[in-house]
Amino acid sequence: MKQFDKVVLSAKDVIKNYGELEVLKGINLDIHQGEVVVIIGASGCGKSTFLRCLNGLEDIQGGDIILDNEIKFSDAKNDMTKIRQKIGMVFQSYELFPHLTILDNILLAPTKVQKRSKEEVKKQALKLLERVNLLDKQNSYPRQLSGGQKQRVAIVRALCMNPEIMLFDEVTAALDPEMVREVLDVMLELARDGMTMVIVTHEMQFARAVADRVIFMDNGNIAEQGEAEEFFSNPKTERAQKFLNTFTFKK
């Protein structure tokens, strides 16, 4: 089992409500540098909401999120725009600007938000596009790309901001089955390179392959967590066992 020392992102007693509905009920979780944490659970368990809380896209009603052991999201003096630059996020819908080329979509945030030089960012963007086998699409428009290609562009766009941590929210859920693998392969490679990642997914085989740790959420709580192989081979709670059984088919 890999050893991880430095905590880079922490959730402390995080509570999230939508009106009377309590979605997250006091979540505690530490994410370590270089660790790949996969969050799984049934629809409506709170996993995607929790992920959005981890980079400040959702306000929380209790507890705190802490970056690098010192930057508290609850502290009003902290600029959430700067915090979000350290925590990249890729969504289920790629949200590329249709009127911009692929390259211009990638260059937009680093040049406008981070005020970096276009030449520097372009060099980085082209390297990343080559890495995900899309260098030849740099001058294409989103409508000319498949869903899998657009999702790989969305990953490159997030990486071009040089984040410390990457969050992935069910990024293959809207893709045709044959396009899923090309996106998951990019994420596997990022994991091998040591990127700190938190991934919400329904792809159980992928979760088992990529995760250092699996978090199983149920009804707004962490019901079970553990090393990936141990969790999938020998889940401790009845709820986790039932959940995993829904992915098993016997003739």
State where each predicted segment sits.
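C-terminal boundary and immediately downstream tail of ABC-type ATPase nucleotide-binding domains
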Residues: 225, 229-251
